[in-house]
Amino acid sequence: MQLDKYTAKKIVKRAMKIIHHSVNVMDHDGVIIASGNSTRLNQRHTGAVLALRENRVVEIDQALAQKWNFEAQPGINLPIHYLGKNIGVVGISGEPTQVKQYAELVKMTAELIVEQQALLEQESWHRRYKEEFILQLLHCNLNWKEMEQQAKFFSFDLNKSRVVVLIKLLNPALDNLQNLINYLEQSEFAQDVAILSLDQVVVLKTWQNSTVLSAQMKTLLPADYSKQDYKIAVGACLNLPLFEQLPLSFQSAQSTLSYGLKHHPRKGIYVFDEHRLPVLLAGLSHSWQGNELIKPLSPLFSEENAILYKTLQQYFLSNCDLYLTAEKLFVHPNTLRYRLNKIEQITGLFFNKIDDKLTLYLGTLLEH
């Protein structure tokens, strides 16, 4: 590990709060990279060079400082060790007899901060590479051998069935995203997390059953989140090997989210199992088969027939219940009958024929 300016500044700030003397931190070349006296930055410190070369504490009094042409100020300089190696020097400015009492305390403070920073970097590295592993699983970019090797490294059990959950932030910001990630990665949740974008996060939940998953969704996000902050989409849980299961669960979660945002914008959670048919049909929307299916309905997509198309949608949303549909549309049942007859005339499809009725229904589900 190399001592960087960020860590050096933390050492100076923490040490000077304790001892109220100016503190300098020098890198492995003896150059001052952080100091309580900003005018000394980027200067080569002779005492630090000597401390590094000989791996010892170097005390500089007024006479020695003068001998060195004040390339170093009076003070005491101690090597900073990490894993048995010298990575820099911490120096306390002042007469050695006055500041010597603080030397070991400052050295210990510096080395603790270095160890803490190294641990944070390791955790950051581990998180970043595990996130990359998860994303590769979702996009099916690994062969079986690579998957086994990386799964073993990250203690990722390939035998556990999982379901993909997508979280979409409606007010994305870097702070919001980081706070959410910190919450989701708490060990008590036992789940894997990856960032897709500034406004989307993916969570892998171990699949037990739909009842357990439903209960987990209630605590998926922090308690202070409101429905105005997010949307959640739960993908399919498929009885397949994990390398097939996760990409398909991810795709179904994406399709479920797209469908939910368009057709149920007021809801906060969209579950694949609750919207199975329209989500599975999503792949047909822009295919030649899909175009053929909706071709008879194309006149209904015009602005002048918008009310008829809305009526058709509500009719199927109401499970073909004539009176419930009329109630939802705030019209008389006879008005509804007139509209349904009009739809039959325009499309040439009839509600009392099963194939025609299915075509009409699919036409309300497919994108156009």
Curated annotation (Swiss-Prot):
Record InterPro entries: CdaR-like_regulators, CdaR_GGDEF, Diacid_rec, PucR_C-HTH_dom, PucR_C-HTH_sf
GO MF assignments? DNA-binding transcription factor activity
Which residues belong to the signal peptide in this entry?
Answer: none
What single Pfam family name could you report for this chain, choosing any that match?
Diacid_rec
Which biological process annotations from GO are given for this protein? positive regulation of DNA-templated transcription
What is the similarity comment for this entry?
Answer: Belongs to the CdaR family.
The protein depicted here goes by the name: Uncharacterized protein HI_0093
Q: Which organism is it from?
A: Haemophilus influenzae (strain ATCC 51907 / DSM 11121 / KW20 / Rd)
